[in-house]
């Protein structure tokens, strides 16, 4: 029984992630079988012919839940009346580019997107940032959407969490469903901390089940941190299908109450939890309870965990300070 309709903006919709994503949204995998979908697809002007091809394919799938497709290069039109803004598109880092260059280029993009969301999106809009560097891009967009409550902005560490769960399951020789409470702390970058001490395998600490601290501290952590680069090296381009899958999973987490005993990783605006500076977009362990997103409290760190936590926190502080110095934050 159809009981809802949602309008979704996807930026960079003709890119590899967008192409892997939009069909899954239209099929009902993101919002469920009882929610009709309208897609507002945004691309740069030169990519509009390719985007029209994506729209043709969406039509040809004859998805019963897909009720409307808008293809546009007009940011304001793309954000008009949307309930969800999936900010997938961003400028990738190129050889010889400093991180500050990347932050400045994308800062301009996400400034405009935040303003358009503020002025044109639905009053209940939620914003899910994927384009990298996603934590700080999310911070910039949030800063320029003053009328949208800050707790409606999220950035994605879902792919990192899924990568980490898979590595633990393989090492322990268990099914992927046995691995729970796998937290990614901090930044979606090579400083992220995949917290194997607080992760569970069949309800027991992963560090106890695997009992190979050298592998966990060195191989596991670095594999998760560097997985994106490894995919690029292997296939010649960045993660696309797995990123799209993680977007589906991440939004599922945000629209569905979390089962008892489970949690998920999500970047959200800090309110000071775990000593993180208020206002930073930081990945925490989260639960959705009765429609409200909450950070899981009272997890503990040993010296190794605290050091990794502080490293990723300091990187996010540095990114914030950089974009502030560039005039991208108030």
Swiss-Prot record:
It comes from the Bacteria. Its EC number is 1.1.1.37. GO terms for molecular function: L-malate dehydrogenase (NAD+) activity. The active site is at 188 (proton acceptor). NAD(+) binds at residues 12-18, 106, 113, 130-132. Substrate binds at residues 93, 99, 132, 163. One of its GO terms (biological process) is tricarboxylic acid cycle. It catalyses: (S)-malate + NAD(+) = oxaloacetate + NADH + H(+). Keywords: NAD, Oxidoreductase, Tricarboxylic acid cycle. Transmembrane segments: none annotated. InterPro entries: L-lactate/malate_DH, Lactate/malate_DH_C, Lactate/malate_DH_N, Lactate_DH/Glyco_Ohase_4_C, Malate_DH_AS, Malate_DH_type2, NAD(P)-bd_dom_sf. It is an enzyme of class 1 (oxidoreductase). NCBIfam families: MalateDH-SF1, PRK05442.1. Belongs to the LDH/MDH superfamily. MDH type 2 family. Catalyzes the reversible oxidation of malate to oxaloacetate. HAMAP family: Malate_dehydrog_2 (MF_01517). This is Malate dehydrogenase. The gene is mdh.
């Amino acid at each position: 029984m159809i009981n809802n309709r949602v309008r979704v903006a996807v930026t960079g919709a003709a890119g590899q992630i967008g192409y892997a994503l939009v069909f899954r949204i239209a099929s009902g995998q993101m919002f469920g079988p009882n929610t009709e979908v309208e897609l507002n697809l945004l691309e740069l002007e030169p990519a509009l012919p390719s985007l029209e091809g994506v729209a043709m394919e969406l039509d040809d799938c004859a998805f019963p839940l897909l009720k409307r497709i808008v293809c546009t290069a007009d940011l304001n039109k793309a954000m008009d009346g949307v309930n969800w803004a999936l900010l997938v598109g961003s400028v990738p880092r190129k050889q010889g580019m400093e991180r500050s260059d990347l932050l400045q280029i994308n800062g301009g993009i996400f400034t405009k997107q935040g303003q358009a969301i503020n002025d044109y999106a639905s009053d209940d809009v939620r914003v899910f940032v994927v384009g990298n560097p996603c934590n700080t891009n999310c911070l910039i967009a949030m800063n320029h959407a003053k009328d949208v409550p800050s707790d409606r902005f999220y950035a994605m560490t879902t792919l990192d969490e899924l990568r980490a769960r898979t590595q633990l399951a393989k090492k322990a020789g268990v099914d992927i469903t046995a691995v729970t409470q796998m937290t990614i702390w901090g930044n979606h970058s090579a400083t992220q901390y995949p917290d194997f001490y607080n992760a569970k395998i069949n309800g027991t600490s992963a560090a106890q089940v695997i009992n190979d601290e050298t592998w966990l501290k060195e191989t596991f952590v670095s594999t998760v941190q560097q997985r994106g680069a490894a995919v690029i090296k292997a296939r010649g381009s960045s993660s696309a299908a797995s990123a799209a899958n993680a977007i589906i999973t991440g939004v599922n987490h945000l629209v569905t109450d979390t089962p008892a005993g489970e949690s998920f990783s999500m970047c959200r605006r800090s309110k000071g939890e775990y000593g993180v500076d208020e206002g930073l977009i930081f990945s925490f362990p989260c639960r959705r309870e009765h429609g409200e997103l909450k950070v899981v409290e009272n997890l503990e760190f040993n010296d190794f965990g605290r050091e990794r936590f502080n490293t990723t926190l300091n990187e996010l502080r540095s990114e914030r300070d950089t974009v502030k110095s560039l005039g991208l934050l108030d």
